[in-house]
């Protein structure tokens, strides 16, 4: 069974993330969307909320599940018997950073491969940070995040403001 891990903060998940998930689900037997627990980074959504949002937007994709993890990605991958890391690339600067991470992960575990997937051009400008800013200033996020979670995001940002 070919298990792939799609790690990230997903704070919140965007249409760009979902596009990568859908495409990866056609290539791998199982895709685990893994929310990284980073104690140094305070997100808008809690880790549990992010996992629930991912579950909500991927509920119709049978071979996708969402989890959280803490620690080294390579250790988590061993636990899940996964050999592939999926990374979405929007721009060249994403590649430069992700290439360094891929080399580090390969150094830590030579059996791990990183698969880079180009983001659909229509999502190349999207980031979770930009979504939060648009909502904070009263803008519309339709088409930027999955429709199923628009209200969740607006409600959360409304409470934080």
Swiss-Prot record:
Coarse class of the protein's main subcellular location: cytoplasm
Entry EC number(s): 2.7.7.3
Oligomeric form and interacting partners: Homohexamer.
Catalysed reactions, as listed in the record: (R)-4'-phosphopantetheine + ATP + H(+) = 3'-dephospho-CoA + diphosphate
Protein name in the entry: Phosphopantetheine adenylyltransferase
Listed GO MF terms: ATP binding; pantetheine-phosphate adenylyltransferase activity
Cited Pfam families: CTP_transf_like (PF01467)
Sites where the protein binds ATP: 9-10, 17, 88-90, 98, 123-129
Annotated substrate binding sites: 9, 41, 73, 87
Pathway per the UniProt entry: Cofactor biosynthesis; coenzyme A biosynthesis; CoA from (R)-pantothenate: step 4/5
Residues the UniProt record annotates as site (Transition state stabilizer): 17
Stored InterPro entries: Cyt_trans-like (IPR004821), PPAT (IPR001980), Rossmann-like_a/b/a_fold (IPR014729)
Record-level GO BP terms: coenzyme A biosynthetic process
Keyword terms: ATP-binding, Coenzyme A biosynthesis, Cytoplasm, Magnesium, Nucleotide-binding, Nucleotidyltransferase, Transferase
Places the protein is found: Cytoplasm
One GO CC annotation: cytoplasm
Transmembrane domains' residue ranges: none
EC class of the enzyme, as a word: transferase
Record lineage: Bacteria, Bacillati, Bacillota, Clostridia, Eubacteriales
């Amino acid at each position: 069974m070919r298990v792939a891990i799609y790690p990230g903060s997903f704070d919140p998940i965007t249409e760009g993330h979902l596009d990568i998930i859908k495409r990866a689900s056609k290539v791998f037997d199982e895709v685990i969307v893994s929310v990284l627990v980073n104690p140094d980074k305070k997100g808008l959504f809690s880790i549990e909320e992010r996992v629930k949002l991912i579950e909500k937007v991927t509920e119709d994709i049978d071979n996708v599940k969402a989890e959280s993890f803490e620690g080294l990605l390579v250790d988590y991958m061993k636990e899940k018997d996964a050999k592939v890391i999926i990374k979405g690339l929007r721009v060249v600067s994403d590649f430069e950073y992700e290439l360094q991470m891929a080399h580090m992960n390969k150094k830590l575990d030579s059996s791990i491969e990183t698969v880079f997937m180009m983001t659909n051009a229509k999502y190349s400008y999207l980031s979770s940070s930009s979504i939060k800013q648009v909502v904070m200033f009263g803008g519309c996020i339709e088409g930027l995040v999955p429709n199923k979670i628009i209200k969740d995001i607006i409600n959360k940002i409304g409470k934080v403001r």
